């Protein structure tokens, strides 16, 4: 109908001797040029903000560039040196442990929180809005509050534990290497939990109630309904949420840098923090860029696996 209207307008203009040029008439009738006109600005913006920095990082990773020096081409020497570096191997291990632990906690706790929010009767909107607060507050600001709660000298957490007579000493949350990793995982989980909970809640709301009634009439209890109705229907949503969260968690910078700056003894360094310290603070731009590019194949593998899971879940449905 819209196409006929446009063609009619063009015919009227032609009858009055005011026919547009062939290029303009084609532009009005065909949808493809209009689509290109709309996506063009976004495409060039992404090209400038994403593609150009990526290509520049690729060049830096293949050079011995330092701060204030352009450097020269060294091939894969930066990557070879990193693979022989104990700090980088520790960073790789930290990133895997951090991402796996945080994703597991966010998935389990997010599902529990989504189920609780789904069953709310009173103050539903107020509580759901409050749950989003950790995700809304700027990361650096909220992490500073967490640092104040866990820092060794005036730790509110330690004061509370000692006041309740749970412990009688100050727990070194941030100076201890293993407790520091536990702390950054805890804060990252707190930060990302609302994203899981609200997204899974949207998936729960979309599940037809008739399926639960049918399962209940077949004798399925609450656990049976959860495993045989809720989980299968939430698999596509879970796969997408885990995919995005894996990308954000693996590339996390703010939480780790504000809390520990990668310490103590490099036990909480992730790719982003180690790349920042090596490339900007130490001035080794080439090696810092090489560290950041190690994220690319890992993220590519994560995306590939998760997309396969989404496709399988869609085929199952």
Model regions and ranges:
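A structural signal for multi-pass alpha-helical bundles of membrane permease subunits
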Residues: 34-317
